[in-house]
């Protein structure tokens, strides 16, 4: 009897130790704006300063997205069919999404100014993936009270390109595709680091700048932004690399022209489809 009791005690102890050995945190390598913790058989996701809790076996079946970047992660994981609504559909260049918009398997639920509460409710999504848009907050709070989960994603705040890539893990968690997400992330990371090693040896670095005018200001990516890191790692010399900002830096056109006129490349020049569209008085000066 004592032997049976001791055996049971050992088994219980081993089981308890096994539970304690489970990881309680999914460690990020580059991303700083989200974290995932395991708590009492649930996953606690903190992203963009907000928290969402889901069961360990959670899998999103129907979602609404308000940002184009979310569609890229979802598509990479093979979960594009879970999207039932998007915001500002004219911004989406994904051909699968455009096709689904035409046949109404994906609905237009609003724009940057507002989202349609009744339409979203009728679509019955499990999850809304969005960013912090003050125009949405009141309606999102109402939808949250209806039991719809809200996941805030702001990958654009990351300061390293692989930090943005690492959001595959966040999307992999909510779509129950973590193995695929890890595999994709590792593949991109391996290739990125290999190319970075090659470009670290270059002696001639072309000068580049980015951005366009919005109103009276030219918004230039800061020196601590993911774009600045991407330019540096790809072998370019970013002319605003010395600005200590992770977001955009508003500049007067004259400031951009003074420094940018000697650049070899203007990268990320907005939504212009041709040089002709850019040839107004100011932009033409940048290309002389």
Feature-to-residue mapping (PLM):
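A short, structured surface patch at a secondary-structure boundary
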Residues: 43-47, 56, 61-121, 127-132
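A short, gly/pro- and small-residue-rich
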Residues: 81-83, 142-154, 275-288
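Flexible, glycine-rich surface segments
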Residues: 197-281
């Amino acid at each position: 009897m004592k032997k049976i009791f001791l055996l049971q005690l050992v088994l219980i102890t081993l089981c308890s130790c096994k539970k304690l050995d489970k990881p309680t945190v999914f460690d990020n390598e580059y991303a700083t704006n989200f974290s995932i913790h395991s708590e009492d058989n649930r996953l606690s996701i903190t992203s963009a300063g907000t928290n969402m809790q889901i069961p360990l076996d959670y899998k999103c079946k129907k979602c609404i997205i308000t940002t184009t970047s979310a569609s890229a992660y979802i598509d990479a994981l093979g979960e594009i069919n879970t999207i039932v609504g998007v915001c500002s559909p004219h911004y989406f260049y994904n051909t699968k999404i455009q096709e689904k918009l035409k046949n109404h398997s994906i609905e237009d639920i609003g724009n940057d100014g507002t989202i349609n509460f009744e339409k979203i409710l009728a679509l019955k999504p499990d999850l809304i993936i969005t960013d912090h848009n003050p125009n949405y907050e009141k309606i999102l709070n109402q939808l949250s009270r209806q039991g719809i989960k809200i996941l805030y994603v702001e990958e654009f705040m990351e300061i390293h390109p692989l930090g943005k890539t690492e959001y595959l893990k966040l999307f992999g968690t909510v779509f129950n595709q973590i193995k695929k997400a890890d595999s994709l992330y590792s593949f991109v990371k391996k290739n990125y680091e290999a190319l970075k090693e090659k470009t670290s040896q270059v002696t001639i670095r072309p000068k580049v700048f980015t951005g366009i005018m919005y109103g009276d200001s030219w918004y230039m990516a800061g020196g601590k932004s993911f774009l600045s890191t991407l330019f540096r790692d790809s072998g370019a010399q970013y002319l605003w690399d010395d600005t200590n900002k992770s977001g955009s830096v508003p500049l007067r056109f004259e400031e951009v022209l003074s420094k940018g006129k000697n650049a070899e490349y203007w990268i990320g020049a907005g939504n212009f489809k041709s040089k002709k569209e850019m040839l107004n008085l100011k932009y033409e000066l940048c290309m002389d």
